[in-house]
């Protein structure tokens, strides 16, 4: 306890508390709980005094309001507590005589120059009201009362004597002290100022003392050694401790939140002077093109699968005169095309290996030999040319239409399915029957959703990439980007979406990067939305006839990088199914609990009593668009996939920071009247994360739209309330 007091209170407060105890012949070492209580009481008195001031005309100011006017201000409260007893009585009598009031029978803690009243301050572990009436019974009306409880309640005889900020400051400090004490198991040791049962002291016998010393955990020789260690341990760190000491100096003004206080987040996303956010997912999604080859559905090696697909589309395979459509800033288009031809030749040859020769253009593409050279710290200090790199702050971007388009296309139904889920045995219990029914509806919606095909492509590619990275660390390998789909007739097709080249992959740590060059087929002309593709070099490599129409085929090339963590997450991308399934089931369960029977079928298709459930799934021309339960489910699933595909530190930060704002909006909707402080600071934390992540920028755009609808809804409710009041 002694160590705790030293760490959490200023030296002057501790010394005054010890002097007070000495006047009553109490020993601080024998009564540490009493010393703590006096320190808390003193600090609360000083907090109240430091927060409130008067000018020459008697007008009150808080510490924040009085900034810049300090020369004309004086404290509103005189602190009597902490003075030597004889001096305190002399000060109390002088103040009473000076202001023409009666001297109280008991010594006060504070004197209020504005109301000309003495004040008693009380701190309690119990209910503030109970302690208030005990004090009231003793003191009568001779002085005002300010009672604060560790339970976060208070009781004042004069409510106007202390503003909201002052009350909040005192209660926050008490909460902090209680939390610190609880961490060190010292909370129950305290004896408050109120009358509570006191323990009985008794001396431990020799046998009990020995048993106590034997019972301590390994690493401690005796009980006293363990207690000393626990008293001195610092579980929360020096920052929190120093903040606790600074609490009287911190100025926080709570404010009741209104709808008008909320503004859109990330105003820069509407700035047309900024570039559109570019596409930066690892693989193409809605723009992908798969070269299909019918198969019996048997398992094949990736190289065999890719070879068969390329043989079927020989005009694309044998193309030697491409047309350059678009070039990324740092790309060498000649090197990229040579590397593509090497990949095709490696896949097409008769050898079983898919190893690539280490040519100069392959080394350029994979960044071989371009890694930083590590040198000793001592050498760096002596070398004047060595300096710390400036941190790379992401450039701000504006919202782009392609993100919404991707979302729309990925959540649509197609005629093919790639999702491969294991079969489940027959139902035994009634609960299993309900689960199977829900699974059937869920799988029917998700199976033919475009997003599930993209998800499986990511899973298969990252599995192959991680295997090759571990098995062939020093080699360049060609990895086909493949998938397998089944159409509505039950026919299986192998799909080749492109080829990738893996560089050297000596991945010692989980965050060590391996370079991956991707070559992907697409029928999308990049010139239609050039702002989407600055990271890609695009060639036109021929055309295909689809449904009697000729379509150009483009090769999208990109130099990229990944690490073990991202590859492992790619292998686990099926987890997107779980989250969307859980959200669907939560909705069905809620409906079922209201109706009293299983509502799975009713939500999807409707029944005799209920029509199919609908949800708001987007906006069109400023109005909300409704969609079926199945459509909402596909939208949720697609959002989960996008969250994985575009996941990075910006998205993590945005999700965490914006959650607070969402909670505030929910509190406003529930009419709970939330209070906030530093709202602009919260906005700043959110907007710091809105830079160049496409999903974050789109989420901010959607949030702003939703906030607009909620504000409009609140105005309607307010007008209804006014009519009802009239």
Swiss-Prot record:
Enzyme Commission no: 3.1.-.-
Gene3D superfamilies named among the record's database cross-references: Influenza RNA-dependent RNA polymerase subunit PA, endonuclease domain (3.40.91.90)
Motif Nuclear localization signal 2 (NLS2) location, chain numbering: 183-244
Location of the motif Nuclear localization signal 1 (NLS1): 125-140
Compartments, record wording: Host cytoplasm; Host nucleus
Subunit structure: Influenza RNA polymerase is composed of three subunits: PB1, PB2 and PA. Interacts (via C-terminus) with PB1 (via N-terminus).
GO CC term, one of those recorded: host cell cytoplasm
Residues binding Mn(2+) 2, per UniProt: 81, 109
Source superkingdom: Viruses
Broad class of enzyme this protein falls into: hydrolase
Keywords: Cap snatching, Endonuclease, Eukaryotic host gene expression shutoff by virus, Eukaryotic host transcription shutoff by virus, Host cytoplasm, Host gene expression shutoff by virus, Host nucleus, Host-virus interaction, Hydrolase, Inhibition of host RNA polymerase II by virus, Manganese, Metal-binding, Nuclease, Phosphoprotein
Family annotation (InterPro entries): INFV_PA, PA/PA-X, PA/PA-X_sf
GO BP terms in the entry: cap snatching; DNA-templated transcription; symbiont-mediated suppression of host gene expression; symbiont-mediated suppression of host mRNA transcription via inhibition of RNA polymerase II activity; viral RNA genome replication; viral translational frameshifting
Family: Belongs to the influenza viruses PA family.
Cofactor: Mn(2+)
One family name in Pfam for this protein: Flu_PA
Annotated protein name in UniProt: Polymerase acidic protein
Modifications made to the protein after synthesis: Phosphorylated on serines and threonines by host kinases, including human casein kinase II.
Positions that bind Mn(2+) 1: 41, 109, 120-121
GO terms of molecular function: endonuclease activity; metal ion binding; RNA binding
Cofactor binding mode and count: Binds 2 manganese ions per subunit.
Reported function: Plays an essential role in viral RNA transcription and replication by forming the heterotrimeric polymerase complex together with PB1 and PB2 subunits. The complex transcribes viral mRNAs by using a unique mechanism called cap-snatching. It consists in the hijacking and cleavage of host capped pre-mRNAs. These short capped RNAs are then used as primers for viral mRNAs. The PB2 subunit is responsible for the binding of the 5' cap of cellular pre-mRNAs which are subsequently cleaved after 10-13 nucleotides by the PA subunit that carries the endonuclease activity.
